[in-house]
Amino acid sequence: MIEDEINAVFEHFDGSNIEIWWQERGHHNDPDKLREVIQNEIFRAEAAGADTIMLAYGLCGNGAVGWHSDSTVLAMPRFDDCVNMMLCTGKRDRRNYLSAGCMYLTGGWSRDEGALLTMLDNYLEKYGERKGKKLMKLMLDSYTHVTVIDTGCYDIGPVNDYADECAKQLNLQKNTVYGGNEPLAKLITGEWDEDIIVLDPSGHIREEDFDFTS
């Protein structure tokens, strides 16, 4: 989901001593599954002798709660989810950066198997055009905009085209907001501040670790 934003960090940073383990898309849709999969990856990294494990995730519907390592430092962004993470373009100054009614898109999300137009195609194939569109409309009832987050880390042209088609097919308005990958850059480069959770061995990630205090 955030592959473009992670790769952009390495364009300006020598991360030759960092091994990236990409994960399958879609785990964030099932927090319990996400918790299990990433915890197993933490155990695997421990066994491989990692001295630090950097987790490029947010709280993700409490999917991160309980992650732990007995022998290795864990570090991860102090954000509820990847959307908030990419909407924060400087130091974190509040917990929630989302705007009501917005369905957010980036390069990664437009390519995801659960992307809007893929979902629509699946609904149309399964239920037919009339019922499929009605079900999508009900599912998106609280949304008014499809919003592209321009993180500067991907070719925005195809994503704008995708967003235009989403807006047309789903009767939404389309707009663009500026974002970035600063929290991920802090995580990867080791420039850890209050925006990064750093957990010593034997500690467990808690929901309250993601609270914001000014």
PLM segments and residue spans:
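Extended, charge-rich low-complexity interaction segments
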Residues: 46-60, 106-120, 199-214
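Hydrophobic/aromatic-rich structural module bridging two neighboring secondary-structure elements via a short loop
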Residues: 49-85
